[in-house]
């Protein structure tokens, strides 16, 4: 049974919707690729949960990228996913990072870029500065700018588990936001330990036991890297053939490493010759 799931829920007595995501296996898969500092482990967990919530909220078919960049010790943290809740991620850092480092201490002067690439239609990109207190507040600002919908986000991660909640006024509903303010106040009382140990139904009962809540069927969230030998070969082929041949002469082979999952793809002289002759096969050995 998959222990990484996202639930949507809606209030029958208010024009408000919500989501809850709880992650463990996919989170550990992302962390296993590199030995991340403690603070960065937590940030990656929050970013995973956030991307899952965003993907479920912004109804579209295609790919999503949530990327943080800055001039601090952490230069990049990115989660890529799609509407099927398949996620992968990686971060780059340099130097020591305190275990309790804040978002600004990790990224310095930075920004968040959310990119939606639908299967059909034009790509959309939204940018928010990282000058808010935490990642959740940055995402709330994104929704304020892009959709102008009152939104509350809660994110938690501890290096082992990650979880998040999203509460939002339904699109096309306007006027009195008293219901949202009331439900937002209830949601803000959630504790990390509750999201890590209780199932979605128990969490919603604890928060909203006096409300009329409908919980929808869960959606699995999974880690899967999209790297492949064919993609690595295509990347090599973008280089001038003379440059590739020089590397081969010096190294005897060309190795491509995936940052996301640490898979290695090796190409020897025979592979490279086949690649440029058009007879390259993805069945070659890694």
UniProtKB/Swiss-Prot annotation:
Gene3D superfamilies, sorted: helix hairpin bin (1.10.287.480), Hsp33 domain (3.55.30.10), HSP33 redox switch-like (3.90.1280.10)
Post-translational modification: Under oxidizing conditions two disulfide bonds are formed involving the reactive cysteines. Under reducing conditions zinc is bound to the reactive cysteines and the protein is inactive.
GO molecular function list: protein folding chaperone; unfolded protein binding
UniProt key word Cytoplasm: yes
UniProt superkingdom: Bacteria
Disulfide partners: 225-227, 258-261
Chain segments annotated as transmembrane: none
Listed InterPro entries: Heat_shock_Hsp33 (IPR000397), Heat_shock_Hsp33_C (IPR016154), Heat_shock_Hsp33_N (IPR016153), Hsp33_helix_hairpin_bin_dom_sf (IPR023212)
Function of the protein: Redox regulated molecular chaperone. Protects both thermally unfolding and oxidatively damaged proteins from irreversible aggregation. Plays an important role in the bacterial defense system toward oxidative stress.
Family: Belongs to the HSP33 family.
UniProt name for this protein: 33 kDa chaperonin
């Amino acid at each position: 049974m998959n222990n990484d799931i996202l639930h949507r829920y809606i209030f029958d007595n208010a024009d408000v919707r919500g989501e809850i995501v709880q992650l463990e296996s996919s989170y550990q898969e992302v962390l296993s690729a590199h030995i991340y500092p403690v603070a960065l482990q937590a940030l990656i967990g929050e970013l995973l949960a956030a991307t899952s919530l965003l993907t479920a909220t912004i109804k579209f078919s295609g790919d999503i990228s949530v990327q943080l960049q800055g001039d601090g010790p952490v230069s990049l943290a990115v989660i890529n996913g799609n509407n099927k809740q398949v996620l992968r991620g990686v971060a780059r850092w340099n130097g020591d990072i305190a275990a309790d480092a804040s978002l600004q201490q990790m990224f310095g002067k930075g920004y968040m870029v959310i990119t939606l690439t639908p299967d059909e239609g034009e790509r959309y990109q939204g940018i928010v500065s990282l000058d808010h207190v935490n990642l959740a507040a940055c995402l709330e600002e994104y929704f304020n700018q892009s959709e102008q919908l009152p939104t509350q986000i809660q994110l938690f991660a501890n290096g082992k588990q990650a979880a998040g909640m999203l509460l939002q006024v339904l699109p096309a509903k306007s006027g009195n936001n008293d219901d949202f303010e009331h439900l937002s106040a209830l949601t803000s009382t959630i504790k990390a330990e509750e999201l890590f140990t209780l199932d979605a139904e128990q969490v919603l009962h604890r928060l909203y036991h006096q409300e009329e809540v409908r919980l929808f069927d869960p959606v699995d969230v999974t880690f899967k890297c999209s790297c492949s030998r064919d993609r690595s070969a295509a990347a090599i082929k973008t280089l001038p053939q003379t440059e590739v041949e020089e590397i081969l002469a010096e190294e005897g082979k060309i190795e491509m490493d995936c940052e996301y999952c640490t898979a290695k793809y090796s190409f020897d002289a025979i592979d490279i010759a086949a690649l440029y002759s058009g007879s390259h096969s993805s069945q070659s050995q890694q």
